[in-house]
Amino acid sequence: MKQKAILIKDFYNDKGALHRGEKVVIEGKAAEGFIRVVTGTGAVYNIPPHIVKKTA
């Protein structure tokens, strides 16, 4: 289930950063309490779901 979303908060980890307003695609669930998202550049991140807002 792929769904488009937009970040509402910044997210940082050792692989890089995602910034507020960035568009991502939700790929599905990752570990418990996290979702897997793909950025426009193709980078994959596991992030908490409360920092994204689903779009149409």
Annotate each language-model stretch with its function.
Residues K2-A56:
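Basic/aromatic-rich interaction segments and small domains that mediate binding to polyanionic partners
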